[in-house]
Amino acid sequence: MLEKVFQEITNKRKFFASSSTGEQFENQFRNELKKHFSEINGDLTEELSHIEEKPNKEIKTTFNQLKKQVLEKNHPHTLKNPFSNLTSHFLYQPFGSQNYPDFLVFIFDYVVGIEIKFSKNDKGEKNLQTSRPMWNSNLPKPNAIYVYGVANANITFFKGSDILSYETREVLLKYFDILDKDEGSLKNALKDLENPFAPYIRKAYEHKRNFLTTTRLKASFRPTTF
């Protein structure tokens, strides 16, 4: 079923690329998902409990375990679906509007996180020479699918593992873990001193590759896996 979603996006590339805002782009993808999956709304625990026919407490425990797996920074494999009856459903912003993922899709035996990335194109250029999604402080997760669009230009999609290897991700994560510890040591050293400045060390990642002219990425996701 997810294969059909991405096939439709491929067939309607111009339509999806016609979005002028990130919100519009995200809503178009959401509407496409609704054609093939049932969206779970309302109280999450109650809805899942009803679908699974299990008590709320058991549902909460199972979902919290799944959440930890979904948010794991370097989980190399597609996640197994812990729910038996959630086989064609999805959640929108399951962990909040500012948190990964934008969509959590349940497909038979698997659970897939999907994140939407969008870049503005104020000049309305049709053939952009360079275009890169913003990653801020989060590296692409290996088992996630990313849908990236540039306003009025183009759209592509890929898995996190297609653009960053497990080994490279591990090196980056370990490095920034060290920085986090160093920041803690700095704050501890300053806590008893008169100091008008609060140190704020912000990690950020910038992708060096041009996404919309990289044909390998356009064909990198093979939705038949799901």
Protein language model regions, located:
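Acidic-basic catalytic patches of nuclease active cores, encompassing PD-(D/E)XK
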Residues: 1-88
